[in-house]
């Protein structure tokens, strides 16, 4: 059995009082053969969004839904914090990460991490398949290193400054081979 349209079109309407009370009421009108065909469409004057429905047009069901629950709230992930300046801190701390030899970069939220080690773990998950031995960032035997561009436009080695200072100044991240890591780029 295939799904079909409901037998009676449903129209959402809200009166002025309902707007003030933030309540949503679902009402419907059963169309008939002799009724105005425009009467079943939401743009019809009979179904203006502020038209007060009465029981003469059919039943009224109060679903008890608050319009406030339907409004979207701004979502902040657990590690994000509010920054009033600099365009919400460059879209909540997301920075672009590129790796030498790859065309496509990725974005990470540095505010979701509490240290260099958790950032390195996420970058290993994203880019670790590019090397047989993995990235192993911040380890002496690694063939890769992580550098970042700060707010002054200078490229620096990640890990040389405390974490809190790093997340305040990082604008871009780049994974390079150690032997190719000659600054600036």
Curated annotation (Swiss-Prot):
Q: Which Gene3D superfamilies match?
A: Phosphatidylinositol 3-kinase Catalytic Subunit, Chain A, domain 1 (3.10.20.90)
Q: Where is this motif: EAR-like (transcriptional repression)?
A: 63-67
Question: Which coarse location class describes where this protein primarily resides?
Answer: nucleus
Q: Which GO terms describe its biological process?
A: auxin-activated signaling pathway; response to auxin
The compartments listed are: Nucleus
**Keywords (A to Z) from UniProt:** Auxin signaling pathway, Nucleus, Repressor, Transcription, Transcription regulation
InterPro entries in the cross-refs: AUX/IAA_dom, AUX_IAA, PB1-like
Domain named PB1 is located at: 92-180
The record's GO molecular-function terms, alphabetically, read: DNA-binding transcription factor activity
Taken from the UniProt entry, a GO cellular component term is: nucleus
Q: What induces it?
A: By auxin.
| Protein's job | Aux/IAA proteins are short-lived transcriptional factors that function as repressors of early auxin response genes at low auxin concentrations. Repression is thought to result from the interaction with auxin response factors (ARFs), proteins that bind to the auxin-responsive promoter element (AuxRE). Formation of heterodimers with ARF proteins may alter their ability to modulate early auxin response genes expression.
State how it assembles. Answer: Homodimers and heterodimers.
This protein's domain notes: The N-terminal half of the protein contains two conserved domains I and II. Domain I includes a slightly degenerated ERF-associated amphiphilic repression (EAR) motif which seems to be involved in the activity of transcriptional repression. Domain II is required for the correct degradation of the protein through the SCF-mediated ubiquitin-proteasome pathway. Interactions between Aux/IAA proteins and auxin response factors (ARFs) occur through their C-terminal dimerization domains III and IV.
Q: Which PANTHER family match?
A: AUXIN-RESPONSIVE PROTEIN IAA17, AUXIN-RESPONSIVE PROTEIN IAA34
Similarity annotation: Belongs to the Aux/IAA family.
Protein name, UniProt field: Auxin-responsive protein IAA34
Q: Which species is this UniProt entry from? A: Arabidopsis thaliana
């Amino acid at each position: 059995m295939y799904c079909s349209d409901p037998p009676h079109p449903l129209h959402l309407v809200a009166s002025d009082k309902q707007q003030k009370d933030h309540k949503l009421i679902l009402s419907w009108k059963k169309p008939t053969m002799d009724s105005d065909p425009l009467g079943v469409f939401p743009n019809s004057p009979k179904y203006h969004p502020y038209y007060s429905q009465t029981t003469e047009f059919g039943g009224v069901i109060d679903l008890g839904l608050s319009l406030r629950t339907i409004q979207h709230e701004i979502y902040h992930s657990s590690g994000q914090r509010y920054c009033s300046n600099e365009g919400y801190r460059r879209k909540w701390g997301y920075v672009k990460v590129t790796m030498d030899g790859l065309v496509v970069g990725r974005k990470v939220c540095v505010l979701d991490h509490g240290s260099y080690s958790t950032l390195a773990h996420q970058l290993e998950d994203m880019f670790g398949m590019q090397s047989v031995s993995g990235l192993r960032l911040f380890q002496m035997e690694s063939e890769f290193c992580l550098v970042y561009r700060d707010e002054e436009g200078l490229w620096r080695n990640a890990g040389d400054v405390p974490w809190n200072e790093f997340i305040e100044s990082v604008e871009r991240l780049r994974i390079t081979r150690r032997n190719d890591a000659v600054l600036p780029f």
